[in-house]
Amino acid sequence: MPKLDRRLFLKGAASMAALPVTLREALAIPAARRTGTIQDVQHVVILMQENRSFDHYLGCLPGVRGFSDPRPLLLPSGKPVFHQPVGGGTEDVVLPFRFDTASTRAERVASLDHSWKAQWNLWKNHDAWVPVKTPLTMGYFTRADIPFYYALADAFTVCDAYHASVFGPTGPNRLFLFSGTSGLAAKHAGPQAVENVDDGNWSSDAAGDHPDFAAFPWTTYPERLEKAGVSWKVYQERDNFGDNPLSCFAPFRGDQNNDLCRKGRAFIDGPEEKSFGQNLVAAFAKDVAGDSLPQVSWIVAPTAASEHPEAPPSIGEAFTAGILTALASNPAVWAKTVFILNYDENDGFFDHMPPPVPATKPHFGASTVATDGEEYGGVPFGLGPRVPAMIVSPWSKGGWVNSEVFDHTSVIRFLEKRFGVIEPNITPWRRAVTGDLTSAFDFQTPDDKPVMVPGVTGLVERMMASAKLDEPAVPAQQSLPRQESGQRPARPLPYRLAMTDKVGGTVELTFENSGTTGACFQVVSAGVMQPGPWSFTVEAGKTLTGDVTVAKSYDLSVHGPNGFFRQLKGSGPSALRIEAKADAKGGLLLKLINEGDKAVDVSIADGYRPGADLPLTVPAKGHVEDKRPGESLGHWYDLSVTRADQPGWLRRLAGHVDTGKPSITDPMIA
């Protein structure tokens, strides 16, 4: 990347280093409401940055599903997923540790391995992070290290279930952002589907294109917008770090005088080796001031501002602040604009949430929706790990958390929803499982209260001062991180999920989805050398039953969207079954069914109310019910049912009852 000369950097970043009063004033401007729908959005601005995972950036943010997740995945060792094994025959582990920007050069570390995951057996247990990525994979930042981004999340909406599209590098993930696929769904199963494939011209200047490069043949979303008459543009400088994938498609190569090239390949000229995004910000600000911003804008940052691990987050924060300041300079434009900040992939940085994957073969599980275009080399290839994503707009103010599952195709689907231009490259499985971002907004009654976002003055100076410090390292005395305390408002979600089990020779799991969007359930068997994991995808309004083969003794965990969790422990067949359904008021109704010939004494423990255990007797060939109101806990529940005659038997049920109304984040995370 460009050498970070202190004098040149401070001069180039001066326009982005302090957040002017204009932005703070603009944050109080209400949305330009005409219809109270998504049609009020006139501009969508998309900034995709580089190579950061969600936990790495925002795992300490209050309320999100981060380091204080009360129900994390358990590894084969029996330890929570945060205890990542070193491997090599030892029992040593690496815990998440802080990338302290005050005492180390954590803002500028070498990029870690972030290649295509390739082997299912290597990654299926989510425990290969340290052996493959090195201990630096477990590094994370806090509010003290990236204060602008934490403040942005406090002021607007953060998405804590937004995933990369591919468990792999930048190239295929950016192809998903610009075309809805990395090729498989378009019947182009070349290496670009999972690897970085380009012609080596890592700049915007088409003069550097290699004529012998085999251009990708499928249609991009900008081409569809162009055909539909929706205005669009890519903002980039000469140095774009090779992050504009349009350069790999035939319509954007060769003659640069056509409309597609003028919008998709043109660049803002400037001193290539000394750019920190100031030229791009100035050109963007000019279009905003002149009310000539297109309906859809993609912003591609120069190398130094890209936030790739060698590129300091503080420069990225200053760059993002510059874009937002430009938008705020014209309040009329701000009032009708959506700004989406996301990251293409996680580099090699750890995230504790296993990504949803489709069952592309029977031994992976089952799906009610087709999984065509979702397999590469015999392995399910999406989704990837979680990455940071924030929605900044007058319709998303208030410090909200949105926990609907998204990926990069969700950005296109938001554009589909607003402009009516459909992208056929998005697979049925992704359309079922990932949302369209609309749940992150309140178009009808947006929050008009003013919000506070700090400036970025001093951050870049701190980064320059840390350049000579040591690289961060795993501390001698390790301890688990804790998130900042407190709950956050949570957006209404489209999930209404249930699961029941029937244990005989196998464990039969029945998944019921009465919500309005699909859900992917991941089933894990505890212990070493166990079968699985399995994935079950259930479309909205459907039910799916699948068998899981286990030993006589079983210990299964089921993870689904928005904290949905079930745990099943026992030995041999069980005549006791439990059904849990949401009631009309957002509470939970438990029905304990005894199909055996003897009464069963059980106890129900409430994880949110320790000591309030409820003893019940379930009569032979009968049932009992227990109703749990949800209002006092924001409709969260965590119940454990045990039976007196079988000490090893357990059914744990946890999650959230979505009511279609705003709620709060999980109290156990607070």
Regions found by a protein language model. Give the residues of each.
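N-terminal pro-sequences and low-complexity stem/linker regions of secreted or lumenal proteins
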Residues: 2-670
